[in-house]
Design a protein with these regions (language model features):
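Extracellular glycan-recognition regions
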Residues: 1-187
């Protein structure tokens, strides 16, 4: 494991215990995100975040290659601020046996995350993509990174420059919780 590309940074939103990240320059960029505890839920936003700033429209994809331990959710996030709260859009795998692929979004001031469910039998490795076109965010999933299936879209007011990256939601405070995300692409 080595130094990650300088455009990427690691941050923690809210209360995160034992968060750390490692990078390897293989499989088009591979991040291993580890955490003892950092949970996202209704009104709660505590998550480790590997991110970079992006201005304007984009297409961001990665593959969730491995999940170990008490990981309730992992995947992609686009967020207007690194602080808790604020508008955010996610495309993640998790919940209910760690097999639900779903788009999520939260609106500043609300204590609720909204969800649109994709495939309810998604297994790793799984590919996810978030696309921004103006004020609309689109979410997709794939089994091979080539053939993409539309999950949902939502209109979300965010600044032109936002934070885009990879997240994990970890529970129970145990060691050895991690996710491996690779084949990272931003256009």
């Amino acid at each position: 494991m080595g130094e990650w590309p300088q455009e990427w940074a690691y941050g923690e939103i809210g209360d995160v215990v034992g968060g750390k990240v490692a990078y390897a320059d293989v499989q088009e960029g591979t991040f291993r995100l580890e955490c003892r505890e950092g949970f996202m839920g209704n009104g709660v936003e505590n998550t480790p975040f590997i991110y970079r700033k992006i201005k304007g429209d984009f297409s961001f994809s990665c593959r969730v290659n491995a999940i170990k331990g008490n990981v309730s959710e992992c995947g992609l996030m686009a967020k207007e601020t690194l602080a808790g709260g604020g508008n955010a859009v996610t495309m993640t795998l998790g919940h209910f046996g760690r097999r639900f692929a779903r788009m999520g979004w939260s609106v500043k001031g609300e204590k609720k995350r909204h969800f649109a469910i994709g495939n309810t039998y998604t297994w790793v490795p799984a590919w996810f993509k978030l696309v921004r076109v103006g004020r609309v965010f689109y979410a997709y999933e794939s089994t091979d990174g080539v053939n993409w299936f539309y999950v949902h879209s939502t209109r979300m007011d965010m600044p032109m420059e936002i934070y885009v990256g990879m997240i994990g939601s970890f529970r129970e405070g145990k060691r050895g919780n991690y996710v491996v995300l690779d084949h990272i692409s931003i256009d």
